[in-house]
Each structure stands twice: as structure tokens, then as C-alpha cells.
Amino acid sequence: MSARIDYQKAAPGAFQAMLGLEKHVHGCGLEASLLELVKMRASQINGCAHCLDMHSKDARAAGETEQRLYLLNAWREAPFYSARERAALAWTEALTLVAENQVPDAVYEEARRHFSEQELVALTMTVIAINS
């Protein structure tokens, strides 16, 4: 799989800014595997094959199992995800689909139960970046 545009070559400053954001997010204490699940779920919703290919490899490198990756699009019914992961996935879906609905208060409240304010900002920035 290849991207249509080589963003690093076409806009190196913008690419470096995104790398800076990624570095910041990874320094906020969120688990690497959680971040990859979030990126994969947003990519599933967005139908981005290139992103799914890249982030499934990154998720495996972060310790994710094949079974959890295969069932990610059915995470609500699958028993393999923790309450924290479920809160992150619900937050990811709500933000990714924000044009269709506002983020429900219940989704926000559940996310706040599992994530500090700093972690939720990092999670939000991850979703914003993958959706950009």
C-alpha cells in the first residue's frame, strides 16, 4: 500500500509538526497499544486502507493480538477490550463521526472516568491527527 501523496516530501514543515504532535502524545503516558487501537478504529470508520495497513503493523509491534485486531470493528460485542479501551474507542468514534452527531455527554463522562484531563487531550489529539 502506498499513500497518494508523499507528505514528508511535499510539505516537510507540516510533516515535522505532525511528528512533534505524535512525540508529545506518546510522552503523555497513554499505552502505545491503546493509541494504535484508536488509530485503527478511526481508520476503519474512514475507510483508509493505507492507514489500516500501517497501524495494524504498529499495533502488532506494540503487542496487540491478531484476535483483538480482527474484532476491533465489533469492539462493543467482543470481550477482549478493557473498560478503559472501550471508553477510548467510544471517544474515538464520537469524535470521528462528530459531523453526524455531537459527542454524547455519556461518552465524555465515561472517557473522563478512565482518563486524566491530560490523557484525554492526548487521546483527542491522536483522533484529530488520524482524521486529518
At which residue positions do the language-model features occur?
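Hydrophobic alpha-helical segments
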Residues: 1-132
